[in-house]
Amino acid sequence: MKKNNTDIINFGCRLNIYEGEIINSLAKKNNLKNYTIINSCSVTEEAEKKVQYEIRKSKRKFPKKRIVVTGCAAQINPEKYINIKEVDFVIGNKEKLEKDTWSNLTKKNSVQVKNIFLDNKMHNNIVEKFEGKSRAFIEIQQGCDHRCTFCIIPFGRGNN
């Protein structure tokens, strides 16, 4: 989705779409320009491949824009994404919903990912509108308290 010269590209679940709207609002409030923000998914290997493809495609299409990778894939493996030469910033799932993250983006470290299990407070951001969408979503939960052996989601989203 194209927003005020900052593109936000969401992969994966509806929660990412919801949070993408929060990121868009925070980007607008902080007058963030010339960025591509990729809200990633890590639920499957194929999802991560799509994220990596989009990173490279976005940089080819808009070489002057700075690339920010956030979302579950960034939360789970920030080193992997900061080591992709096209990526400028990697931001964790909790950090992407904090206004300070976006107001000081160029002044901070390139990797802003904290331990997702140490912070279990809910954010209090409200989505004012879903731009370019015919459906809206509400947030039911942010994480999961179960630890199914096959599931990576708690490590990307934290506890509920």
PLM feature spans:
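Proteins enriched for Cys/Gly/acidic motifs involved in redox and nucleic-acid/cofactor modification
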Residues: 1-160
